[in-house]
Amino acid sequence: MNNLCADIGYKSLNHFGEELCGDHIDVIEQDENSIVIVLADGLGSGVKASILSTLTSKIISTMVSQGLSIEDCVETIAATLPVCSVRGVAYSTFTLLRIVNNEEAEMIQYDNPMIIILRDGKNYEYPSTEMNIGGKKIYKSRIKLQENDIFIAMSDGCIHAGVGMALNFGWKREDIIEFMETFYDVGFTAKTLSTILDRKSVV
């Protein structure tokens, strides 16, 4: 055990013209020092995407917080959410971040942009293991935490920001990393950092 604690903040941005966001975030405290955070992104936008992402995040966060394996979680999601008949892709993607005893971080990622970790002011390249569960390519990582580590999880709404307009090819992950590195030493809260990223996505 150590004296570290997690500061969590997030922002959601509705698709233009939609009343509901297609992304959903769930945060569940397993105990005083362990937290499960799930970001799910429903296919499309609006009401349908919101329902799908909410269902996905609720299922995963609840199952993981109860100690069930990621294999069980993914199999349940696969059985619950159908695959789009037109695109042939799952109706919802997800990113799971679990803080264990404020000492380790476990990441499970499916079809969202990979989590960005900033450590000592720079991007930290962490190892990941590829798994195939129910035909889905899942990436699993586990790292030791250090003080002032910053984890940035996002849906593809960030990397598609400005496509064909302000940014011809969207906002690339490496450009997001470079942008967020500039705020590392400022001491902003997680909520402020997520707001900065959110606002930059719509500029």
Predicted regions and their residues:
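Acidic loop->beta-strand submotif enriched in PP2C/PPM serine/threonine phosphatases
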Residues: 18-32, 125-163
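Catalytic core of PPM/PP2C metal-dependent serine/threonine phosphatase domains
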Residues: 52-121, 138-139, 186-203
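N-terminal glycine-rich anion-binding loops that anchor highly charged ligand groups
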Residues: 26-35, 45-51
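Beta-strand-turn-beta hairpins that frame and shape the catalytic cleft
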Residues: 3-6, 31-34, 101-104, 146-149
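Active-site-proximal, acidic helix/loop segment immediately C-terminal to a metal-coordinating Asp/Glu
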Residues: 45-66, 151-197
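Residue-level marker for buried hydrophobic side chains located in beta-strands
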Residues: 38, 109, 151-153
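Regulatory cytosolic signal-relay segments
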Residues: 1-20
